[in-house]
Amino acid sequence: MKKNIDSNIKTIVSALKTLREQKPLVVNISNYVAMNNTANALLALGASPIMAHSRDEMAEMLSFSGALVVNIGTLDSLWIPRMLFAVEQANIHKKTVVLDPVGCGASSLRTATSWQIAEAANKLIIRGNASEIIALAGEKGQSKGVDSLDSSEAALGAARYLRDTYQCAVVISGATDFIVTAGGQIQLNNGHAMMPYVTAMGCTLSALTGAFAAVGEETGLAAAAVLGVAGEIAAEQSKGPGSLQLNLLDALYQLDEATLIQRLKLS
């Protein structure tokens, strides 16, 4: 067990170093609520975000970017063909697609669109809260709009089903994060109880997952670890959600190898 934990820590630390060296470009088809938060988080960590929504530029963008993040948070029927075209271009250029199925299960449109995107992607990582993961697997979860009422543990079976169905990695985010891959599952116990009170925190995790995928860490582990540790550090310096939002950017920017290793809680 310790050997596996040590190996995972090395993977996380190495991925962060590589990301900061390479500064990968990440194409984000994101939502209006999350765009500013996710772009700033990517910049703070060392990646380069571009918020691209036009079909007319998507083929070109995916030819030189490192990964594609598709976030359905403010879904509109006009966006769906663009999202699917972007996934098609990512497939052509062998780029990883990170799907954030925001509110999957809250409406039939969100659920059907999430299924379409998951089925279309060749190299896929799914990042969602427990209720979204459960709904994406075709089960009935408990949600309140885009917020999960299910525990991360309750979604493990659904995550394994998605992993096997789409040959992908699945990140379940919540009070406890789980990474589910062909190699098994990893549990992360970092983060802070204040984090859910800042909008787009999950969207930020999806964006960071795309950045790490662009440099070869294609499980979501490094992104979840880095955001969890940075969230803890930021919360210690914050009086509430407003200051947490700002302090998180500083924590991502300042996060170093020693602090990351010291604070990681993996099992």
Swiss-Prot record:
List required co-factors: Mg(2+)
Q: Where does ATP bind?
A: R127, S173
Q: Which residues form a coiled coil?
A: none
Q: Which Pfam families match?
A: HK
InterPro entries cross-referenced by the UniProt entry: Hyethyz_kinase, Ribokinase-like
Q: Which residues of the sequence carry a binding annotation for substrate?
A: M51, A200
Q: Which HAMAP family match?
A: Thz_kinase
Q: What is this protein called?
A: Hydroxyethylthiazole kinase
Its gene name is: thiM
